[in-house]
Amino acid sequence: MRSVADRVKRIGLSETYAILDKVKKMKAEGHVVYDLGGGEPDFSTPEHIINFTVSAMKNGMTHYTASKGSPGLLKAIANRLFEENHISACWDKNIIVTPSAKHALFITLMTLLNPGDEIVIPSPCWVSYIAMAEMAGAKAVDLPLTRENKYQITRKALAACITDKTRVLLLNNPNNPTGHILTEEEIQVICQVALEHDLFVVMDEIYEHIRYITAPHRSIAAEPGMFERTITVSGFSKAWAMTGWRLGYLCAPEYVLNEILKVQQHSVGCAGAFIQQGGLAALIGDRQPMEDMVKAYRKRRDYMVDSLNRIPGIECYVPEGGLYVYADIRGLGMGDAQTFTLWLLAHAHVAVTPGTAFGKEETMMIRLSFAGAMETIVAAMDSIAEAITEYDASLQQEAS
């Protein structure tokens, strides 16, 4: 039989979905499993968004929109980008609404990258970045970030990744999995290097509203000279608990956006018409539900970090944004992240994600999500601590 395309064969399945499949199997067998693997908010989509969307459907908003999106939502996005991100974007020239921020990233990379190009991606990074780059035929170049350096990008490290084949720099701010938020110094380094080497910058800002520090969010596209080379991607899934709606958007200079639009038109066509109305309701409606969710996430983050840091052998970087804690397990002496993750699922019935899902060098790190309910987090932390205590006790018995 004929084989499938090489570009698909050379990428692997998502490790986060693989863990989710294991969790579903255990639950189907009757086990109680505490799932800290995915970034799925436990909150329901705010009522005013649902009501607005249902009304739109009943009033005939069930047909195609323009491929860029509906004018109302495009204008609302442009207003938000200007007021909150200080990005001056024309609603009809610089924005495309997409069925998820993930799709926005995909069509952007398909547009920017040629086979053989290089794209620099800070590591650790979200699982799909590298797969997307490889599907475009490009080579993903790791920019290693370390916990010891607070996951900050330095000019020396970034410059060392640049070659004559480098075309794109892809960044996530706040970062998944570390929760790091770019500092002023890092922003200036990124801008300087991008301008010096004539690079495109793709900014994934899906977690921009989920922040736990007082400093306001900074968008690279708002920096001097950067709008014409920056593609900003965001969406509604995380901040508004709209993961199942699949709605995102991108903002790009017109000459780039017109090319990205071709990929949108020849793939999905447009985002769902009534789904777009849900996004409009989120942007023009009451922001209090989003702010309340962020307050709850902060409490969950604090509880999880404190609980994990109480376990001898585990150390956590306190995330400044996002929905995850990135923990160092090397002090446990219980094997690498892959081994520990499987052990944890079997003995504590807690699902977490191994660091190797976010970078091949992340062999002693695990990611835990605090997007779920506080009672789930409390039970999971107790179960982890109890399982590790029992493991240590069994080792002591064997030694004696």
Swiss-Prot record:
Positions bound to L-aspartate: G37, W126, N176, R367
Origin: domain of life: Bacteria
N6-(pyridoxal phosphate)lysine: modified positions: K238
Record-linked InterPro entries: Aminotransferase_I/II_large (IPR004839), AspAT/PAT-like (IPR050596), NHTrfase_class1_PyrdxlP-BS (IPR004838), PyrdxlP-dep_Trfase (IPR015424), PyrdxlP-dep_Trfase_major (IPR015421), PyrdxlP-dep_Trfase_small (IPR015422)
The enzyme's E.C. designation: 2.6.1.1
CC cofactor: pyridoxal 5'-phosphate
Subcellular location, record wording: Cytoplasm
GO BP annotation list: amino acid metabolic process; biosynthetic process
Keywords: Aminotransferase, Cytoplasm, Pyridoxal phosphate, Transferase
Function: Catalyzes the reversible conversion of aspartate and 2-oxoglutarate to glutamate and oxaloacetate. Has very weak prephenate aminotransferase activity.
Protein family according to the UniProt entry: Belongs to the class-I pyridoxal-phosphate-dependent aminotransferase family.
Name assigned to this protein: Aspartate aminotransferase
